[in-house]
Amino acid sequence: MKFLVLVAFLGVAVAFPISDEDDDKIVGGYSCARSAAPYQVSLNSGYHFCGGSLISSQWVLSAAHCYKSSIQVKLGEYNLAAQDGSEQTISSSKVIRHSGYNANTLNNDIMLIKLSKAATLNSYVNTVPLPTSCVTAGTTCLISGWGNTLSSGSLYPDVLQCLNAPVLSSSQCSSAYPGRITSNMICIGYLNGGKDSCQGDSGGPVVCNGQLQGFVSWGIGCAQKGYPGVYTKVCNYVSWIKTTMSSN
């Protein structure tokens, strides 16, 4: 799940939910088109607990705070409550967290999952390219997931939800979370609130101009004014990703 905490307050978990009239999807998003995010996966342990991104036929990228030693990866998933024949379920053979992951600060919140067999790629299951450069502030990106659709209360969707949101500047990000943003994090969303990723979206993709630039990591609450979502900055990890994949 997305960490809805200010992770450096002496280890105390705090979240400040608010009401919002526009809470309908992700929070404030919409139901994705069926093949809008063929790279989106659902991480399962008897239930959906996090998202992830298929970056090769046998590797998935997600958040380290989603770690479990054994994971069932569902690909081609769209409606969690129904099957349309496009789904593939493949168990993990390896789950590799970044060695520098810090559970308190959520720095280096990244992990790789090796599938026990290669996925069959098609229009519903496909890979997303890694970034060739870091994304610039102001770029609109696509966020997707099956996380909570309410900033106050809980309403989890069956159908994959999408949200278009802008990348914020590093100064906007640091101002929202003073002293807590590292160079491995980016903020994406709306400072006025109302639209955001939420619990259950963790590890799920942020795709900008066709490249995987981030995935859901943490924040204070969901869709709260002044507190945009914080995402792992994938462009900083391309070398780590490629090295880890080639050596495993």
From Swiss-Prot:
Native source species: Gallus gallus
Family annotation (Gene3D superfamilies): Trypsin-like serine proteases
Disulfide-bond pairs as recorded: C32-C162, C50-C66, C134-C235, C141-C208, C173-C187, C198-C222
EC number: 3.4.21.4
GO biological process, one term: digestion
Organism superkingdom: Eukaryota
Record's protein name: Trypsin I-P38
PANTHER family (alphabetical): RIKEN CDNA 2210010C04 GENE, TRYPSIN-RELATED
Main localisation: secreted
Lineage: Eukaryota, Metazoa, Chordata, Craniata, Vertebrata
GO molecular function terms listed in the Swiss-Prot or TrEMBL record: metal ion binding; serine-type endopeptidase activity
Domain Peptidase S1: 26-246
Marked site: Required for specificity: D196
Tissues of expression: High levels are seen in the pancreas while lower levels are found in the liver, spleen and thymus.
